[in-house]
């Protein structure tokens, strides 16, 4: 199994030169292109690879907890019919993941694959005429926390992940869910396209709401994902913690679900202390670079904090622009539809990203898919937040 492409991003014991909060408050967004030494700036993809690692370390250290690496020998994958089963063994403990792959009725294998975090919320008609397989990632097999009571759930430190990594019992769910997602891709790689009928170079991930956040973390922390579509991810996803500080009726750092994050994040960065945070979520978005990212918003739900996401995405776009690949990031923010109910008006943006980044149609134009309400553009001063 090829592992070099994972950049050794998230090894246990990786040093954190930015393991402390900022020495003084910074209201505007931290520069994603500035290295931890405070002087060196990213000039090319090689530099960005290093900077991306630094950002990933900060997000784990302060925000979600560690996403541990797994040796290839710990993975044992098999197909039972159309179901992918992956056993992950760490020490004496084994965790089993299973996900059914639904293959398209058009095209020839190996197929591109879109993985839905928890479930694929994008409308099925987007896939019916495209040679893209779909699969849902059952995150409860790793960490079964849910805000609702529609299924039994365990508390922090009691999940299946914690059997394998008891020393990481304080982790937030998003690090653990991202870990499990990566193990599914490990399984696909191990078996190969002859067995799975999947092209692992054309994998996408998408989810909505809490699962939109999950999709963003999964795509950011695994560079084998070609396309990330984060649908209505809200605060803790694409939205800037800084922008949301003190804003009423939105999900901000003081009003999020801390089963998802490290409790220490709230202790360190509550209230105005958020301005001491050495990163923000425009940098989580930027971690997807140089791959493709599309964010879908819904202004009908103020809790989703789309204004803050608008700021974050424009800030993150600076990284793609620096590398000359700004066609790989876009956003589409509108309203007049239900939560996680993608309207037909947003189909063209999604179709363009699917066709270009999963199906390889290079003639598709994804430049300047930057769709937001006019009042965002008129009332939000991007220069106040983006000074790099």
PLM regions and their residue ranges:
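Bacterial Sec-dependent N-terminal signal peptides
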Residues: 1-21
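Alpha/beta-hydrolase-fold serine-hydrolase catalytic core, especially in secreted/extracellular enzymes
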Residues: 21-98, 103-109, 289-291, 298-388
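Hydrophobic beta-strand anchors of alpha/beta hydrolase catalytic cores
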Residues: 112-114
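Cap/lid segment of the alpha/beta-hydrolase catalytic domain
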Residues: 116-201, 234-243
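Alpha/beta-hydrolase-fold catalytic nucleophile elbow
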Residues: 206, 231-232, 296, 334
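Gly/Ala-rich beta-loop-alpha elbow adjacent to hydrolase catalytic centers
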Residues: 207-211, 215
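Conserved hydrolase catalytic core segment
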Residues: 221-226
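Mobile cap/lid helix-loop segments that gate and shape the active-site cleft of serine hydrolases
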Residues: 227-284, 305-313, 321-326
């Amino acid at each position: 199994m090829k592992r070099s492409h994972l950049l050794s991003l998230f090894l246990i014991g990786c040093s954190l030169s930015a393991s402390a909060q900022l020495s003084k408050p910074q209201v505007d967004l931290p520069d994603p292109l500035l290295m931890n030494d405070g002087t060196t700036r990213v000039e090319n993809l090689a530099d960005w690879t290093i900077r991306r690692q630094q950002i990933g370390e900060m997000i784990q250290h302060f925000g979600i907890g560690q996403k541990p690496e797994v040796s290839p020998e710990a993975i044992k994958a098999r197909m039972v019919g159309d179901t992918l089963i992956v056993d992950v063994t760490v020490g004496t403990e084994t965790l089993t993941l299973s996900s059914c792959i639904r293959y398209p009725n058009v095209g020839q294998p190996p197929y591109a694959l879109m993985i839905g975090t928890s479930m694929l919320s994008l409308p099925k008609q987007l896939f019916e005429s495209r040679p893209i397989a779909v699969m849902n990632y059952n995150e409860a097999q790793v960490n079964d926390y849910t805000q609702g009571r529609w299924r039994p759930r365990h508390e922090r430190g009691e999940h299946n992940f914690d059997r394998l990594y008891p020393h990481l019992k304080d982790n937030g769910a998003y690090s653990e869910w991202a870990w499990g997602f990566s193990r599914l891709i490990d399984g696909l790689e191990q078996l190969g396209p002859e067995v799975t009928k999947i092209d692992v170079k054309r994998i996408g991930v998408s989810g909505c709401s809490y699962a939109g956040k999950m999709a963003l973390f999964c795509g950011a922390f695994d560079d084998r994902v070609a396309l990330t579509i984060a649908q209505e991810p809200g605060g803790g996803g694409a939205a800037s913690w800084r922008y949301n500080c003190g804003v009423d009726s939105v999900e901000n750092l003081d009003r999020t679900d801390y089963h998802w994050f490290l409790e220490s994040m709230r202790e360190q960065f509550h209230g105005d202390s958020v301005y001491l945070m050495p990163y923000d979520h425009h940098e989580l978005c930027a971690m997807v670079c140089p791959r493709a990212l599309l964010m879908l918003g819904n202004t009908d739900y103020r809790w989703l904090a789309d204004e803050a996401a608008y700021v974050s995405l424009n800030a993150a776009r600076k990284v793609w622009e620096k590398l000359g690949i700004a066609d790989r990031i876009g956003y589409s923010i509108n309203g007049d539809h239900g939560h996680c109910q993608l309207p037909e008006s947003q189909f063209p943006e999604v179709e363009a990203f699917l066709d270009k980044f999963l199906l390889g149609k290079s003639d598709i134009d994804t430049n300047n898919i930057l769709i937001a309400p006019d009042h965002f553009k008129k009332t939000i001063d991007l220069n106040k937040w983006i000074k790099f």
